[in-house]
Amino acid sequence: MSTPDDRHHSLPRRRFLAASGAVLGLGALHALTGTAASAAETPQWRPGVRFAPARNWINDPNGLVHFQGEYHLFFQHNPDGDQWGNMSWGHAVSPDLVRWQELPVALEPDELGEIYSGSAVVDHHDTSGFFGGQPGLVAIYTSAGDTQQQCLAHSSDRGRTWTKYEGNPVIPNPGVQDFRDPKVFWHAPTGRWVLLLAVGDRIHVHGSPNLRDWELLSEFGAGHGSHGGVWECPDLFELPVDGDPGRTKWVLIVSINPGGPAGGSATQYFLGDFDGTTFISDGAPDEIRWVDRGADFYAPQSFSDVPDGRRLWLGWMSNWDYAEEIPTDPWRGSMTTPRQLGLTDTGDGVRLVQQPVDELAAVRSNRRAWRGVIGTGRSPEFSGTSLEVLATFQPGAARSFGVDVFAGGGHRTRIGYDVAAQELFVDRTGSGTALISPAFPARHATPLAPTGDRLPLRIIADRSGVEVFAAGGRAVLTDLVFPDRGSDRVHLFADGGNAAVEVEVFDLTP
């Protein structure tokens, strides 16, 4: 996990969520806090379908796991303030990845230090010996005191209460500064648990039969990918290519801060093979593959034990360049919409693809649709502040085309495609409250070569952020925005010529 100071030097990190039994999702601020909104509070920016805590600071998602009918989201949280510090594990649960209930803080600092990022697993066969032969939840996290060390906690009551292991730390610090963010999963072919650890700008792989006794197996990272900042929050999982179970690749996820393509923090990935001991990348050492080229997708983690086998994840929707300055109150920080992952073969090789989870369709309402030509004459206008937009464009002679969201009062967030540059972009320079930091107002873009005469866009515009998925999720941009009150219009645009479009717009109402 990163800290605000990782831009200059590396320090330990911390965690999140306030204790509340309220169901989050509609931005019902009074129900969440039990108090009247003050003039400083900003309910207009509380996400509708993305998770945000009732109050105070959050950053990285931690311990994502499904167990006994619930998705668990733990997260870095400061229960006592809206700045990074006093890191604890906040906790929320959901039956469907859309409607979240915030629970009391799960893990608090102790004599070993603050509670930094980590993961959680279901110990189905009680390999740890914590559960008397029954399944239970085990959290693996970094304790950050004088040094960073890896520790365990376990729960026998569906994650409601936790007992820290008396033998902590299970992986002591070997004398390095950055030694954190354990990600654990069961590797069936070798019959053992595997743990990934971010160590400086490397990933260490450990193995264990019981979650308590760990052996260092291998190291990855020298000369591979981006080393513009400290490496953090690793993840590793296997995915089929284009859904073919006979053709799979392992995906290694590494977040870095700083060094991202949009400035500040970002997440890269590597494709390759993993035999339970060693990850071998199949890409050129100097090749850098970014998960998301927007500014605000960091430290993603995937869920363990998803019942139908999908690989699902979410990330922290912020950037360390300005995370402590975003203008929301009484909370600071939110997560992205959960996404489902896949691999697809493109003209440039196999690439990671992302789409919002299928569960999001259940909260669609108020469908509006239009088909026609834009660029000359009047185009349709829609409205809303928590929306899903599905648009398929045929460019025609247009030089650029796309969708403006959160428009009105001279402001807009422009999402579009530049035909000549062959790039998808989000322009938030005119999005409203932009001057929270010199790094904030910007245009972010990602390469996207055309694959035919149509470009499908899927946009989640949820009150204080946009998530854009193009061409089946081959190109993704995630950006925070803070529109002014009344900036709730959606327009289609085409510059330099006409473009044909088919569009559907849905309200998102959990």
PLM features: residue spans?
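N-terminal secretory signal peptides
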Residues: M1-L11
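Juxtamembrane helix-loop transition sites at the ends of transmembrane segments
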Residues: P4-D5, T33, L492
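N-terminal export signals
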Residues: H9, R15-T35
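Residue-level detector of intrinsically disordered/flexible regions characterized by low predicted structural confidence
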Residues: L32-G34, P61, F469
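Beta-rich carbohydrate-recognition and catalytic domains
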Residues: A39-P182, W186-W231, P240-R293, M317-W370, ...
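Beta-rich accessory regions
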Residues: P245, D273-E287, V291-P510
